[in-house]
């Protein structure tokens, strides 16, 4: 936690973004994030591409290409962390100041979706499988994890649009949220098993 939220101090020193929102509740509970959080979001918006895509690392010192550049679970930090800040401090400044960038990212995810399902990314990274093989998501389909983040982003963007007084965007994201939830349920909801895929761990969860 010095300038950049690095993955670890000994090997992966880049600012991998998923950790920021995943440990966000702990960060906001234990530390004064009033300076660091806005800096993280500035790094993200500085790194954001012209089409709205948010790379997996910010600052982006190196581009890994393909999946390692673009994953919803990582990029969604631009949407999720400003709301964690708002929930902790009651300050919506980060949301209102970065609203356009947040819109561009969610609109980018929409452009990558097919029938409401987002299918790209790294998924549930480093889940454990028999034999110790790690890395890419093995137990849970990438579309399930990616689309779940997309849904959460749409829900938050509906709130963000309301905060800035943009009725058109509020209706847009609210309507899209409902449509994507329906698509998610059609794709992944099984009445006897709740939300599931063919993976055993999914059925258990």
Give, region by region, the residue ranges found by the protein language model:
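Short, surface-exposed loop/turn segments at secondary-structure junctions
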Residues: 6-10, 93-95, 167-171, 192-197
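Substrate-binding groove/exosite segments of carbohydrate-active enzymes
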Residues: 1-111, 117-122
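Extracytoplasmic/periplasmic, Sec-exported soluble proteins
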Residues: 70, 74, 94, 139-149
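Acidic/His metal-coordination segments adjacent to aromatic residues that form catalytic metal sites
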Residues: 55-67, 126-143, 187-191
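Single conserved hydrophobic/aromatic residue that forms the stacking wall/gate
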Residues: 195-205
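Core alpha/beta catalytic barrel or barrel-like domain that forms the active/cofactor pocket
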Residues: 117-125, 147, 153
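Short runs of predominantly hydrophobic/aromatic residues within well-ordered alpha helices
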Residues: 17-20, 147, 203
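Active-site neighborhood of glycoside hydrolase catalytic domains
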Residues: 144-194
